[in-house]
């Protein structure tokens, strides 16, 4: 759950470091404020200064929409060239609800579980890979998006459509998670094929 303030952020950073020492990959939802988290701190995060990661085991996820066009990033998704690692489906995701029900939800908290699922798939087939390796496989094997998109949260009265930016400016990787490509890259790393 993304917040603007953390009374015990040092505890969270220690927990991240502990998870790293146990080779655990943490998949973190970037948040749903349509803002650049490179300039506006949100918690939890894996950086004390918005520049340097405290550990290489946290994968922060932005949400993509159902559209493969300028509306690809979800209009609510947080983004950041330094602090969001990759995007994943996060709009109208069919999920469970209490009392054995189902409903469609949107948010980076829907994008993070699909990414965690891909990470689990990679690690189940290739258990010798470290958390850090899996993180970088997901970031580097995703579908590269090479077109302009509407920057999330940029629509205004003066500019109802919003500001156009290259998708690659919204995350470290400029990519969308892709399970097949992740498995192929993992296989190449492990088996050298």
Residue locations for each model-derived region?
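Residue-level marker of structural boundaries
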Residues: 35, 102, 143-144
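Glycine-rich, charge-decorated loop segments at or immediately adjacent to ligand/cofactor-binding or catalytic sites
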Residues: 28, 32-53
């Amino acid at each position: 759950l993304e917040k603007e303030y953390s009374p015990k952020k040092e505890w969270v950073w220690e927990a991240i470091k502990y998870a790293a020492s146990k080779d655990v990959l943490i998949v973190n939802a970037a948040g749903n404020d349509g803002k650049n988290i490179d300039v506006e701190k949100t918690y939890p995060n894996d950086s004390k200064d918005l520049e340097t990661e405290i550990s290489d085991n946290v994968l922060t996820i932005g949400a993509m929409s159902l559209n493969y066009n300028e509306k690809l990033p979800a209009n609510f998704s947080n983004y950041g060239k330094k602090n969001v690692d990759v995007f994943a489906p996060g709009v109208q995701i069919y999920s469970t609800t209490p009392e054995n029900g189902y409903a469609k939800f949107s948010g980076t908290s829907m994008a993070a579980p699909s990414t965690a699922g891909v990470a689990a798939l990679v690690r189940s087939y290739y258990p010798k890979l470290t958390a850090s390796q899996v993180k970088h496989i997901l970031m580097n094997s995703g579908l590269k998006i090479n077109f302009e998109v509407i920057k999330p949260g940029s629509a205004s009265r003066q500019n109802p459509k919003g500001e156009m930016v290259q998708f690659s400016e919204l995350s470290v990787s400029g990519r969308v998670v892709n399970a097949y490509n992740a498995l192929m890259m993992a296989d190449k790393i492990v088996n050298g094929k």
